[in-house]
Amino acid sequence: GGSRETIPLGTAYPPGTYTVQLVDADRVVAAVEQSIQPDIVIRELQLGRNNPEDMFEDAGNFTITSEVIVTVENVGTGPERLIELQFTGDVPRPTPDELSGSGIMAVNRPVRYTELNVGPGETHTLYSGTSPFGPNSDVVSCTPEGTSGQFTVGLEGNVAHGVVEQEYNVTYQGEDLTDCQITIERANE
């Protein structure tokens, strides 16, 4: 008879191919190779201002108008710890180079956390914490005829040591950013 052993992996492992061996009395009787690699995909991006019902409970008006809802999925075979959410390009408030914190406001009532573990096959919703669509900007403006641009959302993980990026097209239409109709769509679709 054999026994089954589960070993928690955590998020401090080097991704790659591992060999799992079945050992009986110091003799390897079977071996299986397994690739353990996270693969984070940005499934959906929503503006809080356009989807207030999807914001977390007790989100204030400023948070609703300036933050973003991001749905991510790990389609890989190993866990990932998301450590930074970045916005670059034509957004009112791009993520500063020297960001203090992660830019992530993941809410799991009653606890809020700023880094997020995503296991293989898991889907999670997180919220931005840097007000990328806040009402003040030196980068973009809202005009009655509409202003178009493009921005990139990046998620950095500490296991894969890379940034997953997704580009979006954006249009700002209205009198000012406080009362602006902002539409986004995934680029390259």
Regions found by a protein language model. Give the residues of each.
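Acidic, polar-rich N-terminal leader regions of halophilic archaeal proteins
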Residues: G1-E189
